[in-house]
Amino acid sequence: MSYVKDIICWKSGASVTDGTPAICEPGDFPEVHYDLSRLAKEFDRDKLSHGPSSLWRYLPLLPVDDPDNAATLGEGWTPIVQTPALGKALGSPQLVIKDEGRNPSGTFKDRGACVAATRLRELGIKTIVHNSSGNAGGAWGMYAKRAGLNCVNLLPNDVLPASLCQSVYSGADTILLDGEWKHSGPMVAEAVQKMGWFNVGTFKEPHRLEGKKTMGLEIAEQLGWTLPDVIVYPTGGGLGAVAIYKAFRELMTLGWLPKGPLPKLIVTQYAGCAPVVKAFEAGVDHADLWEDLDVPPGGLKSTRPPGDQALLKIIKETNGAAISVTTEDAIAATTQAIDLEGLFPCPEVGTSIEGLRKALAQGMVTSDEKALIMSTGSGLKSVPVFPTPKFRTVEAGGSLSP
């Protein structure tokens, strides 16, 4: 049984028919609304502890009719890891990290792909298409296969090997774009019109957001139905961060979280693709096209983030910020996390580690605030981006002594 009430465009309020191309204008997006009053009467949050250790424990807050339809690989319920050594180094002693690298494909993208693929199968969709800088391509290839959907992935020609293999070996029709990435969106839109495929790109349909919303649901439950003071999130299209805050608002409406201020949102981007940061610093409510893309292979390639307006609104409402970080500083921060904590996040997360350092130095965040960094993916997805490690060699039979 689903508690979905309707799907409407976030900004305009226009109604959207499930399973059809969204009619929302640029800067707007389709959003699922639930009958939270009925849900609050019929479902108690204590029942969640009896559910599976996956995102499917939150079925009442997901847009799926039948849990038996779930195209699951065991995604979600990723740990929140205490990081005292890194926190001390940054000046944030209560710092914790939610490790999304534990998901099946190695990133948080599995959440959106899982829930959306499940719902699209229920709706009878046959072929999906989207443009991805890599991680979502791997996730969609895997979950489309799980759901029995045909998948067309448009990826950049510098896509990292792990994501490429996940896409190709799962049977997705994988196409590499030889040219500027800003052309990928229009190319997908043209294919949708010509072929009738269903576009599952960022904010193009409502169900990916609902899957990623489970990150916020987990944060609240894993922290004992409280919230951190600050959330630091590496941001490309903006879907993940927007989804987390949708979760918090729904939990407050249900009475599962006490009503109060939402966590301060700090979004971070590479300096070579920072349209949200540029908009934040200019004090405007939307991001313009970023022309000169200069980032390493992997995520955070969104030159015109479709969630820009929602993201900037959350930043403003929570007294947050948007911070850019050089590629070099991001990679250095990532290797610092490996050295101090034994965690192996992707370089995108390094923008958030270094971004938190900057936020603390500039007084945007204080040392007594509890900060949570969203580690959106595993460093295993991004090995070629890291510098060649230094190590010793020894001949067979030789000594291991220094």
Where are these regions (language model features)?
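PLP-dependent amino-acid enzyme catalytic core
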Residues: M1-P402
